[in-house]
């Protein structure tokens, strides 16, 4: 059986912005905070191919993709249709298309059949998980009222899997295109 692997991109941001995101995650998503640092998930829980094939594919996509500048200015409610829980996301307006295109490029070739077509992709950094959607909505509304501004860039993608409650890296690939 193939391992369950993810591809993420860690944002490069001002240290104060990363500290703010980390503080929000520690307060509102302790499980995610302990698992992995702030990130955009690009490939979700994939076990469609062996690790060597997966890594080679991600390396090839990264080699032809340029670094992606982004700017998150919106805290968005992410409701879970299968649970009363809900999430708070930081969503980029600048960089949205480029991150989405990177996601789409990763789900080609050997990963093409692994893409979930029933869930639209929204690039985001999860900053909270709440017991109810109204709680998440209230948190997002407060952030948006105060003003959200997190500029940065994505310069690499990381492949990894969850091992003993931690995201263990299997490879890092710079965006070189």
Give the residues covered by each predicted segment.
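Short, exposed beta-strand-loop hairpins at the edges of beta-sheets
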Residues: 159-163
């Amino acid at each position: 059986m193939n391992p369950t692997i993810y591809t993420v991109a860690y944002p490069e941001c001002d240290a104060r912005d990363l500290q703010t995101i980390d503080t929000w995650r520690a307060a509102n998503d302790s499980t995610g905070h302990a698992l992995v640092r702030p990130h955009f998930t690009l490939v979700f829980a994939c076990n469609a191919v062996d690790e060597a094939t997966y890594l080679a594919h991600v390396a090839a996509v990264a080699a032809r993709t340029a670094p992606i500048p982004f700017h998150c200015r919106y805290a968005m409610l992410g409701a879970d249709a299968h649970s009363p829980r809900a999430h708070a996301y930081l969503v980029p307006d600048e960089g949205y298309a480029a991150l989405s295109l990177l996601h789409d490029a990763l789900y080609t070739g050997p990963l093409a059949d692994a893409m979930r077509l029933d869930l639209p992709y929204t690039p985001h950094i999860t900053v909270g998980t709440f017991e109810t959607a109204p709680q998440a909505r209230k948190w997002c509304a407060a952030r948006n009222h105060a003003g959200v501004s997190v500029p940065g860039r994505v310069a690499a993608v990381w492949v990894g899997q969850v091992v003993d409650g931690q995201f263990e890296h299997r490879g890092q690939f710079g965006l070189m295109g």
